[in-house]
């Protein structure tokens, strides 16, 4: 795809969701996931027993083991302690009659991860769904929230149902659509149209909404109607409160109207302003120049109220009272504070498609490719930005607020799956204990997705009666989150004095179906190799 055609697609999406053009334009989408092959995943089994594991249950409780976990079909039916640490296991007390066993002695088992900001590829990036799904599953992501559903409402709903039936190798999908996407009645320019669209989307079967854009949706009366109708119909809501609308509606104002969660940081520092009402934009600022947009974003948090100030505490107190959820997506902006690190991440060579790599390159026409002349000062500003942003997120968690994990990969040198794990590392950098990181990645993500429906958890913790979405890891992820990367972690073997790779998820289990995580990564590597050979052939 040419840069021009990439830009046309992106502009179409942005204009569509912001109400600048009527949404009757043709929806473009990527190739859906292929049907699951006979050799892709084993099970579900009548009685699968995972034996001898150390369990991290996702609630924040410490590890415990050894345990045997019994799964029947797609549900956990029993978690049984079978001994004591560093002591022999007595077989007499172990569950029996397995139709399939996994020996997880010395390994760790966790709930499947929830990526609360996970786009299923994009036409501009040239990423087929299979590529994206397998990268997620290889990194333990068994559930995603698709914020925006820009492949089209019907497309995402079809993929959601195919995943629910395990017809494809994919995480379970929660479809959040953007206001106005998919219908033929124009932009949401009145409260009545906003309510009508919510009812239309509910009838289609969506799970919730991601509010994004710069059009009338930010008008307080339209936002209020939209969010009120969404809550009335038990639909979720989140937002990317972009700069073009945040002067009218910051995060706190939206939360008061019923918004349930937020993405990134947009609208939060603006809610913390105590000596200004708009960001200190340079007078030659142009939002459509992404070097301006992201360069100045890195100078935003220092314009907000200081940590511990009355304004800081007042905003945090009210968001906590409203039971508001923060989904920070630290990872997607990380290149802004260290461009070279993001560009040279070791997984790019083997696992990044050539089309995606081209999309990442500096360009005024591709979203998130704003490295026109990125400077040392830009990176310093972003490092300082992160310190304040992370301070708010960590304190919000410490005071009882829910913080979830989302990656927003597919932009800014961030790769699906790999950079979900990087998000976990960045939460630890912000001050989270690794058990708090795992809780955000599992139970809290599940709570965010279940709460609007008023239903109890179906996944997100390891507990009898819940869905069998599990991860089995050979190494201790609490000691080093890097062992969750598909490339593993580097360690010097003191017995051999040789450097070795350790870790990488061994098995990802979704709905009781056991997937070999390394095989999923090998499938991705073959896709990348084939794309590179095709590109080389075209150049000859």
Protein language model features and the residues they cover:
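Histidine-rich, glycine-flanked metal-binding segment
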Residues: 30-36, 40-44, 55, 61-110
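C-terminal helical cap
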Residues: 53, 371-374, 380, 386, ...
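Metal-associated gating/positioning segment near the N- to mid-region
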Residues: 93-167, 186-192, 246-254, 275-276
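Divalent metal-dependent hydrolysis catalytic cores, especially in the metallo-beta-lactamase
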Residues: 132-153, 170-181, 202-216, 235-238, ...
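Active-site gating/metal-coordination segments in enzymes
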Residues: 178-233, 252, 261, 289-306
């Amino acid at each position: 795809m040419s840069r021009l055609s990439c830009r046309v697609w992106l502009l179409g999406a942005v204009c569509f969701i912001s109400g600048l053009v009527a949404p009757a334009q043709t929806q473009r989408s990527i190739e859906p996931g292929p049907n699951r092959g006979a050799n892709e995943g084993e099970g579900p089994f009548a009685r699968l027993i995972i034996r001898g594991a150390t369990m991290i249950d996702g609630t924040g409780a410490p590890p415990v083991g050894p345990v045997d976990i019994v799964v029947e079909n797609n549900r956990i039916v029993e978690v049984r302690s079978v001994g004591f640490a560093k002591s022999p296991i007595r077989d007499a007390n172990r569950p029996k009659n397995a139709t399939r066993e996994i020996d997880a002695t010395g390994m760790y088992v966790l709930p499947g991860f929830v990526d609360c900001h996970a786009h299923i590829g994009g036409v501009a990036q040239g990423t087929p769904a299979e590529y994206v799904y397998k990268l997620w599953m290889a990194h333990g992501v068994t559930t995603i929230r698709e914020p925006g559903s820009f492949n089209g409402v019907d497309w995402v709903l079809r993929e959601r149902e195919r995943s629910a039936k395990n017809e494809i190798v994919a995480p379970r999908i929660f479809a959040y659509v953007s206001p106005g996407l998919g219908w033929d009645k124009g932009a949401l320019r009145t409260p009545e149209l906003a309510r009508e669209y919510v009812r239309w989307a509910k009838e289609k079967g969506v799970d919730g909404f991601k509010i994004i854009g710069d059009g009338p949706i930010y008008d307080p009366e339209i936002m209020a109607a939209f969010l009120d109708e969404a809550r009335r119909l038990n639909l979720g809501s989140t937002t990317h409160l972009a700069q073009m609308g945040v002067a009218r509606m910051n995060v706190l104002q939206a939360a008061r109207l019923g918004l349930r969660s937020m993405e990134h940081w947009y609208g939060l520092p603006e809610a913390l302003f105590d000596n200004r009402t708009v960001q200190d934009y340079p007078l030659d600022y142009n939002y459509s120049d992404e070097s301006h947009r992201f360069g100045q974003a890195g100078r935003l948090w220092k314009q907000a109220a200081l940590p511990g100030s009355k304004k800081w505490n007042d905003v945090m107190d009210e968001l906590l009272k409203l039971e508001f959820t923060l989904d920070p997506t630290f990872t997607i902006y990380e290149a802004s504070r260290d461009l070279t690190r993001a560009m040279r991440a070791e997984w790019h060579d083997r696992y990044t498609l050539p089309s995606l790599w081209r999309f990442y390159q500096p360009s005024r026409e591709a979203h998130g490719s704003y490295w026109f002349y990125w400077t040392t000062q830009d990176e310093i500003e972003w490092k300082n930005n992160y310190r304040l942003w992370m301070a708010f997120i960590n304190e919000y968690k410490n005071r009882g607020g829910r913080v979830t994990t989302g990656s927003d990969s597919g932009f800014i040198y961030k790769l699906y799956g790999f950079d979900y794990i990087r998000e976990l590392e960045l939460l630890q950098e912000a001050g989270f204990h690794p058990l708090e990181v795992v809780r955000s990645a599992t139970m809290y993500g599940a709570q965010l997705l279940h709460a609007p429906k008023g239903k109890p958890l179906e996944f997100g913790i390891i507990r009898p009666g819940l869905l069998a979405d599990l991860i089995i890891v050979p190494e201790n992820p609490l000691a080093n989150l890097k062992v969750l990367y598909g490339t593993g972690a580097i360690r010097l073997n003191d017995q051999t004095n040789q450097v070795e790779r350790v870790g990488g998820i061994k098995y990802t289990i979704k709905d009781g179906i056991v997937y070999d995580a390394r095989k999923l990564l090998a499938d991705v590597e073959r896709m990348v190799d084939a794309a590179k050979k095709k590109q080389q052939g075209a150049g000859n």
